[in-house]
Structure formats: structure tokens, C-alpha cells
Amino acid sequence: MTDTSAAGNPTPGQQPANPPSLRVLGQYVKDLSFENPGHPPVQTQPNIDLGIDVGASPHADGNGLFEVSLKLSAKASAGDTVLFISELDYAGLFQLQNVPEGQVEAMLLIECPRLLFPFARRIIAEITREGGFPPLLIDPVDFVALYQSQYRRAAERAQNGNGGAS
């Protein structure tokens, strides 16, 4: 461990040689779809079904490059009538350096989507507004809780898969 001052900063001469870093190299829309099968309602409060998914994969170039994808889907309905369906796959190219092996997955599935989310949220709001509806403003997402939930589900699937093989 390094010595720290009262402010929590490393003392002079004790700076880490290679601190972990996360760089955003680019952000882009991979896929965007908006379907408006009906017309915008005049006074109907629609039921909104939201879906959020996060994925990450190493980039072909290597060098600590990863593509992180944030998928947002929204389906609005009033009764049995579908008002709109919006789907967005928004991605970023990130470079991780000097991140400990055990922290890479959490960095990719928590911190990277946290950086992408405000931009994806704005795109969803604009596309619903352009579709003739009030802008859909998605509440902030707790990516730590989402990561923990995905991690638990993966562990349960692995346990159930191994349990069935015995």
C-alpha cells in the first residue's frame, strides 16, 4: 500500500507508477429504431415498458480496447394499442490501461455504461419527441445494481447447469 496524507492523496515520492486509466475513444449509434404504428394519443397516459441491457467485448485491435454496448428499449401502449416502440443500441470504444484483472469486468459493465447513458437517454428523448410524443426521459440507472443482478443470474445459471450435469 502507499502512504497517504490526511486528504487521502499519496504522499510525495509515493505516486503509483502506472495508475489505472479509462479512456473514451469514441461513442456511436450502432442501431436505432422507432416504430409509430398508431398516432400520438391526445389525452392518454401510456404504459411504458423499459428494457436496459449492457454488454462488452474486446475490440479486434486488442491493446486494452473494448466495445461497450448499452441497449435501451421502450414500448408504449394504451390498453391493447401499441403507441410506439423504440430501440437503441448505443456503444462506445474504451481503452483500459493498468486496470487489475479482477476489476476489468466491473469497469466495463458499470463505469463505461455510466458514461454512455446520458447520451443514449437524450437520443431516446429526442426520437420519441420527433415521433409526436412527449419526450421519454428515462430515469438514471443504477449500473452497480444492474451489474450485481446480471452477475447473480449468471451464477445461478452456472449452478443450475452444473447441478443438472451431476
Swiss-Prot record:
It comes from the Bacteria. It is found in: Cytoplasm. One of its GO terms (molecular function) is unfolded protein binding. GO terms for biological process: protein folding; protein tetramerization; protein transport. Residues 1-21 are annotated as: Disordered. GO terms for cellular component: cytoplasm. InterPro entries: SecB (IPR003708), SecB-like_sf (IPR035958). Keywords: Chaperone, Cytoplasm, Protein transport, Translocation, Transport. Residues 1-16 have a biased composition (Polar residues). The keyword Flavoprotein does not apply. Its main location: cytoplasm. Homotetramer, a dimer of dimers. One homotetramer interacts with 1 SecA dimer. PANTHER family: PROTEIN-EXPORT PROTEIN SECB, PTHR36918. Belongs to the SecB family. One of the proteins required for the normal export of preproteins out of the cell cytoplasm. It is a molecular chaperone that binds to a subset of precursor proteins, maintaining them in a translocation-competent state. It also specifically binds to its receptor SecA. This is Protein-export protein SecB. It comes from Hyphomonas neptunium (strain ATCC 15444).
